[in-house]
Amino acid sequence: MTQTTAAKEIHRIAMRSANDINDAIAATIGRGSVVVTEQDLCPEFFNLRTGFAGELLQKFVNYRVRLAVVLADPNAYGERFSELVREHATHGAVRFFRSEEDARQWLSS
């Protein structure tokens, strides 16, 4: 799903592998931002030991594509994951939200 807001596009893209991350970056670099929900992410994203979350977040930061991650309850994934969410509370490129509406509002700003 794509939403256009004042020359910005917000894309909803599933990211379950490194290839998906690269495809998402290629599709949106310079043209938009991405919102993902828990259902759009693989289980490895929530297990920080796999490195998948770090790779995903770092690529979005490096390529300056804004990413909003929607999670109903970040605490459900453990203390370390909750710390990651808190660390990104004011981040300029990657943030976590409890609702897709809040995520899209931030991406549109």
List PLM regions with ranges.
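Amphipathic, Lys/Arg-enriched alpha-helical "gate/interface" segment within cytosolic domains
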Residues: 2-109
